[in-house]
Amino acid sequence: MYIQQSQIDVNSTMIKPLKNSNGISNSNINSFSIKNDIDSNINSNSNNIGNGNGNGNNSCNDHKNNNNNNNNRISPTLSSSSSSSSSHTTSPIIPSSKLNSNTTTSTTPTSTTSSTPTTPTITPSSPSVLYKNPMEFDNVFQFKEVLQRVLDSQFQSDWVAIIAKILGYILPNNDIVLRKCQNDEDVKELLSLLRPSSQLFRMIIENFTNDSFQFYFPFDRIPKCVIFDITIKNQSTPKIINQININQYKKDIVVNMFQYFFFAFGLFPDHLNLEMQLLPANLNNNNNNNNNNNSINNTLNSIENKFTRTIHGIPTFSANRQNSGNRLSSSTGFNSQRIFSGSSSSSSSGSSQTDNSLLFNYQQQQYMMSQKTKSIYLRLLSEYMDFFLPFQRSLIDGNLIIDPNRKLMVNHDMSLTFLKIITESLLGHNLLNQSLNILNQFNYSLLSSFKKPTPVYLSTIQTFITYFQCYSYTFNYLSPFSINSPPSSPSPSPITSNGNKSTTATATIIQPILMTPSLGLFFKQREIVSSGLFEYFVSYFERLDPNDQYLPIDKILNIWVGWLTPWDPNTRTSRRISPNVLQKNNKSTSSFQNLLNLTSSFTHSIGVVGNSGGNKNSNIGSASNLLVLNQEYYSKWENYVIEHYYFYSFIFNLLLIRSQSLDITSYLYIFKSILNIFNSPVLKSLLKRISKHDSIIVQQQEQQYQYQYQQQQQYHYQQPQFYQQSQQQQSQQQQQQQQQQQQQQQQQQQQQQQQQQQQQQQQQQQQPQQPSQQQTPSVSSNYIDVSKDILLRLEYQIGFYQIREFINERNLFSELMVSNASRLVDILTLKINQQNQKDYLEVIKSLCTFYDFEEPIIKEKINNTTIINNNPNDINNANNSNNNNNNQSQVLLSPNRNKDGTLNDMGRKQIYDGKVICKPFDSNYPYEKLISQPLVFEKQPITSEEIGIIIKFGYMLTDNSQTRLFIRKLARKKLLFSLVLILAFIWFFFEIYFFFTRK
């Protein structure tokens, strides 16, 4: 017999806390410390697992009337007979889809022997629990009381509801506690409730391995890479999901408390998307649910239309259009002023100034609220990472201390689980093309969608990568292939902000290092982050839509360059997370302003300015980002480049391919900076050396294939012995010849090196008067010493990233890469005009310098295009070649537009930045034909054939479409000139008439 659903007051229902084997309640924990043997303490809590009764309603599927009596199986519904075997536990409250049902339930704890294994109960994450849960609070202090009641009741079924109040569910709403911080006290109180020292966090840590309470997580929110790794690759370490069951009838994702919280936390940027407009709280309190959903959708569409205000001085249509306001009020049943102000008002249309002020206040309020929420979230992310990935700083100046031998006082499994969940939540939303090719039709329909990265996700990823680079810096960027060998150069001391070495830090030289548990944890953590980042970059460049006009390529490249250039620890690590900086900010500004400043410092690009418009004073490619051979060049940077070689080569190849079909003006400046970094002599020579090792791996791979092919032939066709002996002799002779050739080449290379050294010595002897400079190691691009260590690292990366079949794509200096670069140069030469001439020439020169091929001659082409542009009236009289060039130049000079010929936001920004010209006569976009469409003609950009002052002044005075159209037609230069001529003729006629009549 199943227990029926009931009407339950979740806030008032108190459930006995779950006790551990020692009889101590988890809710009465006053102190908490993390040790390496924390697993033993946590596992003791799960010895007695209670069993509960309930009926759950899952949003993704229906599990009704299922009675599973297996010990190791999780079931959403349990029979009443199974509750008789529970020990000191009560049945958790299962939130139903309808909390207003008039049924009853009872909870009766029964005591039996604890030796009988029981089955935990799954609590469904139903949307009805989130929108109809009686948990209500108006500020952070009321939320503190609600949270305390939930903690005292050992969560039970309130866990889903309380997480929804903290981190939201699916749709954005104003009811989460992070959006209720109004002042500094609220921010401090909320951080104290959620940070690692809070009771909530300690309770989550205590229940890391406790599976007595499990929950259904929404399937649509789980990253696709997680589902792919568990179901297709069968990867179960670290365990981030307890159970997954996907078929045509149901989609179940079962997690425990720890997994549920950090999945919800890692996916919280979905709620932080600044482009999504949030509704006022009044719309969420509508009694009619069906009408409420329709009104919300219509209001969102209307608000998005009202936000398309004039951009960069080019008129589109007003924010308080009467048509939009009428459509808004008619579709939703609310007045526009009521929506934006949050109070009821009459349906009469107010003045335009009042409506504009209300709209501006609404936009400003929503933007500031989103910024507050984002700042608090990024602060919590940094504190959680500091808890699970700790590193040391000096007590005096706050610089990072390099100490790979330190012992990490954190549970290793817990740290890996946290890092895997956060990495997949931020980076694992899109699959690679090679992963999609192995899916069947059902899995392809589930996992093939592409999620475009939002600005909030990108800023969160930047914060995540910045912290992990600091963490890796303290381990000296060690490699598992070289930990038993001493470093080739002494480890550097921390560097202060003035550029001088710090003498207060205790960082010393790391002698031959043995594998320790902390190093093993670091290597596993680095694998998790590097694999997630590699798949993130590759999947984005593989599957981006080239027709999308709002691609965040500049921000993606910003993160990529920050990952590729970890040097210069002064500016990119120690200063950013220094305690002194926090103290100075606390003294100079308020706590809330300090929170904003701290978040901006965390999210600031690592020596990179990712402005889509292109900040010409970008720091990318400066001296701090270039790898140089001086006293600051250490073996760890060479080690880092070798360990991440395919981040440089494979993704750069995708960038070259995608740039051929995209407009690079949106990421032109960061693209130039990337080429400057790659063209630095030290990094270029190092990349060439590694690429030659990659070609050696390809040769070995081909030889292995040939050897296997010969063995297969010998197996199928038995050859005579004398033939086999002759073959062996021939192969031995070939091997001897190859060895002799290699020895000769090595001798020649050594002779060349000796000659170069002699020449350098002679030059030094000839110039004795010059001051002696510190000798730096020389890297010769001609001499390549085959290193087994490099070969092992490249082999590991090829297998780890699964790019063995991409032979030409993964080599930075392969023939395919050179051809892609030359093709991009040819395309850029055709797109050169007066506006982008300087920038495009820099890109072309950098590509030609990096791949060592001649620069194309493009001066004549520039002159031809400029002559044609200066004489538009002679197009019909030109020959066919001139016509083709003219049409091509017109397309390049014209800004980005919509299908109807109107400018979009990207086109307006191009005009504002002065990158393109808005021509009045364009054969591709005949503006004269657009007059038949009033709304389109009203949003038409101002051309040189119109008087802009009259149009702007008329648009400011009125919002009437007919009046605006009349002003737009009247403001034409030809029409005004003809009217002036007519008036002048009439005046001249009357003057002559009065002159003769007076006589």
From Swiss-Prot:
Bias (Low complexity): 45-128, 873-887
Domain of life: Eukaryota
Gene Ontology biological-process annotations: mRNA export from nucleus
InterPro entries associated with the record: Sphingomy_SMPD4
Primary location recorded for the protein, binned into one broad class: membrane
Compartments where found: Membrane
Any coiled-coil regions, as ranges: 723-767
Residue stretches spanning the membrane: 976-996
Recorded topology in the membrane: Single-pass membrane protein
Keywords: Coiled coil, Membrane, Transmembrane, Transmembrane helix
GO molecular function terms attached to this record: sphingomyelin phosphodiesterase D activity; structural constituent of nuclear pore
GO cellular component entries: membrane; nuclear pore
Region (Disordered): 45-129, 873-904
Keyword Coiled coil: yes
PANTHER family registered for this protein in UniProt: SPHINGOMYELIN PHOSPHODIESTERASE 4
Protein's name according to its UniProt entry: Uncharacterized protein DDB_G0293534
